[in-house]
Amino acid sequence: MTEYKLVVVGAGGVGKSALTIQLIQNHFVDEYDPTIEDSYRKQVVIDGETCLLDILDTAGQEEYSAMRDQYMRTGEGFLCVFAINNSKSFADINLYREQIKRVKDSDDVPMVLVGNKCDLPTRTVDTKQAHELAKSYGIPFIETSAKTRQGVEDAFYTLVREIRQYRMKKLNSSDDGTQGCLGLSCAVM
């Protein structure tokens, strides 16, 4: 069974834990209890493949930012979550993305941009803005509601598909013999 290490990142209060718990337990948590770090595992079938999702739900609070490098190092794919009623959380996405790219030492990291709380009547982040940001990053954008479950599976499953594509790309690039050699000739001594 293939395992996928997913990491849910974003500012405090955007609904990272609510999204994760909705996926894992089919239940909406409406009280806010800031997360330090929680890990969940769930077996699912995505596109006919049985997968084990290893999901790390992270702290959004700034005081836990020192822990970020560690989980960013081990994660394979990232759900970058903002709340559609919180412009600051949307602006913060770029900070998370840049930190992920720095820690992974790569511009090509599987990610999905997630606009949560789409069940709310008022929004400060326009869908068009979010689509444009995702397009500029070259990643998918999905609106979700942890409360109604709208888009929850779609967000996590899309991330798994992004990781699959990334793995295939890495596999194909290593077939040309240049992997690890930076295109130079290698010799075993």
UniProtKB/Swiss-Prot annotation:
Keyword Nucleotide-binding part of the UniProt annotation: yes
Compartments (UniProt record): Cell membrane; Golgi apparatus membrane
Regulation affecting activity: Alternates between an inactive form bound to GDP and an active form bound to GTP. Activated by a guanine nucleotide-exchange factor (GEF) and inactivated by a GTPase-activating protein (GAP).
Residues at which GTP binds: 10-18, 29-30, 57-61, 116-119
Top EC category: hydrolase
Assembly mode: Interacts (active GTP-bound form preferentially) with RGS14. Interacts (active GTP-bound form) with RASSF7. Interacts (active GTP-bound form) with both SHOC2 and PP1c (all isoforms) to form a tertiary complex; SHOC2 and PP1c preferably bind M-Ras/MRAS, but they also bind K-Ras/KRAS, N-Ras/NRAS and H-Ras/HRAS.
Protein known as: GTPase NRas
Source lineage: Eukaryota, Metazoa, Chordata, Craniata, Vertebrata
Encoding gene per record: NRAS
